[in-house]
Amino acid sequence: MIKNIVISFEEQKEESRGSVEFQVFSFTNKIRRLTSHLELHRKDYLSQRGLRKILGKRQRLLAYLSKKNRVRYKELINQLNIRELKTR
């Protein structure tokens, strides 16, 4: 599933690097990579800080997308297999 998403995003990479979906996709890849790194290196506090910053950026982008286009937001959440934003 993830490999198919990567391939579809790679095909669209040249024309849509600035799109919200591509940015969320790249942040999600960074988050997964940092999470696996932190499982091995629990006391790497700089990586923990970087992970929190990337999580915040992704959260802001997802909030923006959910306000602007709810259908694209739902599709992206399902494709990347991540949870929805908590509503207040």
Curated annotation (Swiss-Prot):
A single cellular component GO annotation: plastid
Gene3D superfamilies: S15/NS1, RNA-binding
Gene Ontology MF annotations: structural constituent of ribosome
Predominant location category: plastid
Pfam family, one: Ribosomal_S15
UniProt-listed GO biological process terms: translation
SUPFAM superfamilies: S15/NS1 RNA-binding domain (SSF47060)
Disulfide cross-links: none
The keyword Protease is annotated on this UniProt entry: no
Keywords: Chloroplast, Plastid, Ribonucleoprotein, Ribosomal protein
Subcellular location: Plastid, Chloroplast
NCBIfam families tied to this protein: S15_bact
HAMAP family for the chain: Ribosomal_uS15_B
Protein family membership: Belongs to the universal ribosomal protein uS15 family.
Subunit structure, as described in the record: Part of the 30S ribosomal subunit.
Record protein name field: Small ribosomal subunit protein uS15c
Originating species: Arabidopsis thaliana (Mouse-ear cress)
Gene name tied to this protein: rps15
